[in-house]
Amino acid sequence: MENQKVPISSVPNLKDLDMISRPIANFPPSVWGDRFINYACEDENEQAQKERQVEELKEQVRRELAAAIDKPLQQLNIIDATQRLGIAYHFENEIEESLKHIYLHTYVENTCFEGSDDLCSVALWFRLLRQDGYRVSCDVFKKFRDSEGNFKNSLMEDAKGLLELYEATHLSVNGEEMLDDALEFTKTHLELVVSHLNYPLAEQVRHALYQPQHKGLPRLEAVYFFRIYEAYDSHNEALLKLAKLDFNLLQSLHMKELSHMAKWWKSLDFATKFPFARDRLVEGYFWILGVYFEPQYSLARKIIIKVFTMISTIDDIYDAYGTLDELKLFTKAIQRWDIGSLDQLPEYMKPCYKSVLDVYNEIEEEMDNQGSLFRMHYAKEEMKKIVEGYMDEAKWCHEKYVPTFQEYMSVALVTAGYTFLTTISYLGMGEIASKEAFDWLFSHPPIIEASESVGRLMDDMRSHEFEQERGHVASGIECYMKQYGVTEEEAHDKFHKRLVKAWKDINEGCLRPYPVPKPLLMRILSLTRVIDVIYKNEDWYTHVKKPMKDKIASLLIDPMIV
């Protein structure tokens, strides 16, 4: 990136300069235009008919779960299918009771169940119980190892078992060397056998090797799993039909929400007022669908997407346009949190600052109506913290200062934005988002630090080359290379190891007993999953290429054929 001379008219309060040198990033424009502004509502009669079908099918699934009360493996398979098809939220109580029953009888009481000597069944049992927070031991896999402690060679012929064990290993916590070995073993052998497998198992293996289920977005994974599940003769027709109908009903809701947000975003005219910033409303909404897609979180989505667009624009003001003096003024204005600070800002900054206050005032009114006004203190404090972090990074960039890796991370974990986004994600979640829950979050527990680490490390690994080309602050990669005298490849390897540990910390943080209600923990896990998906190969939020467009289209454009 080159510093570009920008006419002073863009900042009319600095009349003593003829031109200002600015670090323009030349971000690509939105690829969507006004694609999502207009939404044609479905015929009410048709929607009502679909909703009736959904209710009937839900009752059928409930009956099937209840009928399998003494058949743990059958229950596990039904639960797994509901989760993979994206409809588990309809059966939270039933699934909770079923898994509790299975845990007590098969683990606490050590009662054998059908398939307890089968790798695929045991791995499924382990994964589903771990996903639900149960501290089941990985010692259950000892029976599949030989006298020397290696996994038996005979397992190489069990592709389904290897796949299920591979998926289970991604729920490991620190100290579980057996699962570390299992991951290496299964990954190696699945890569060897995948070309010899038939559809749909071959497709399942390829997909899992690219995107493990535990790190994927449930809504996105459901789109992929529909065709896989349908291809198996053993699929449950009621489950499949329910999932497709429910997907389309939810898609209509999401499109309606996005249309509303698109009109709001267009009315702000940020694309014109901040042409240097990323215009990413649609990508932001996709991000938020990864945090929660369920209908009961509609208000929460509307809150967080507005704040998300604000912080994305602020990030780019600090990162790709503002001068150091201008940024100091904006930082002070955020700390004061007062409309009276507007007059102290450069002209181009005023629409952003005013919009931030307007968005927060709108949220504050909603919180007041709910009797939850206390939440706004946390939301404002997090905004102040992240803007302070942006300011620190801007100073480093201006001074061409390369901090130590530890100094860098002390700021970069904040600017990764994941404590900020987690805080905002709690605002619309109802009574479970108590003052105690926010205090817990602000105590910076290990799970939130791990989530921040994943966000920061993956961002740096995928975007540092583009950012260094445009004169960005030194990324974690550069800081690590300089401090430890290693190559870029070695730095990436160290970052990968840190990512592995961070995911284990997240898994540990999701185990019982829960420090806060489980749905609040799930927001942290879900936000981390979004990073794994969007930054898996490169920064698809900034550079919206075909893979990202296809993902968005699958959730927000293309309906399921029922």
Curated annotation (Swiss-Prot):
Domain of life according to the entry: Eukaryota
Gene Ontology molecular functions: magnesium ion binding; terpene synthase activity
Required cofactor names: Mg(2+); Mn(2+)
CDD domains the record matches: Terpene_cyclase_plant_C1
Listed EC numbers: 4.2.3.-
Sequence positions that bind Mg(2+) 1: D315, D319
Gene3D superfamilies listed in its UniProt record: Farnesyl Diphosphate Synthase, Terpene synthase, N-terminal domain
Protein's GO biological process: diterpenoid biosynthetic process
Motif (DDXXD motif): 315-319
Residues bound to Mg(2+) 3: E467
Pfam families registered for this protein in UniProt: Terpene_synth (PF01397), Terpene_synth_C (PF03936)
Family as reported in the entry's similarity comment: Belongs to the terpene synthase family. Tpsa subfamily.
Purpose: Catalyzes the formation of beta-elemol, guaiol and bulnesol.
Protein name, entry field: Sesquiterpene synthase
